């Protein structure tokens, strides 16, 4: 009984951390990486698709991405999609290749991004604590229904608390890495 509740809680906490990593990957640091353009949508024959489905995205050097659309007709659409995204990038096309230089971040912008990153991490912590609460409520319901003893409930709650602590520690680790990455000049 309690095992399924613990497994569910662990899986959901893992998803919260994965979600945090995905959100943080979208936040631009001064360094170029291909996941930066993952959420940029390009119009392709009437429907919006992710840029990765219409072009190759590669890292040329530490501050430059190259985007190579698979069809020559898509060059201007891909360039426009990157320009109009909320990333503040200015792509330039040279024939069939689009180069996307990463502008250096100002100190003020870095501090703003650190605040955003901390907010995302706090959201992940809250989500993990909510999962703990849900699991504990499920355990209480089992005790009420006399399916498990109060001792079993206490043991399971302790294990869920350990899970919560380890996942929140993981969130803090991910946050520290991203902050360090943001503050590098």
From Swiss-Prot:
<keyword id="KW-0648">Protein biosynthesis</keyword>
<dbReference type="InterPro" id="IPR036191">
    <property type="entry name" value="RRF_sf"/>
</dbReference>
<comment type="function">
    <text>Responsible for the release of ribosomes from messenger RNA at the termination of protein biosynthesis. May increase the efficiency of translation by recycling ribosomes from one round of translation to another.</text>
</comment>
<dbReference type="GO" id="GO:0005829">
    <property type="term" value="C:cytosol"/>
</dbReference>
<comment type="similarity">
    <text>Belongs to the RRF family.</text>
</comment>
<dbReference type="GO" id="GO:0043023">
    <property type="term" value="F:ribosomal large subunit binding"/>
</dbReference>
<dbReference type="Pfam" id="PF01765">
    <property type="entry name" value="RRF"/>
</dbReference>
<dbReference type="InterPro" id="IPR023584">
    <property type="entry name" value="Ribosome_recyc_fac_dom"/>
</dbReference>
<dbReference type="GO" id="GO:0002184">
    <property type="term" value="P:cytoplasmic translational termination"/>
</dbReference>
<dbReference type="InterPro" id="IPR002661">
    <property type="entry name" value="Ribosome_recyc_fac"/>
</dbReference>
<keyword id="KW-0963">Cytoplasm</keyword>
<protein>
    <recommendedName>
        <fullName>Ribosome-recycling factor</fullName>
    </recommendedName>
</protein>
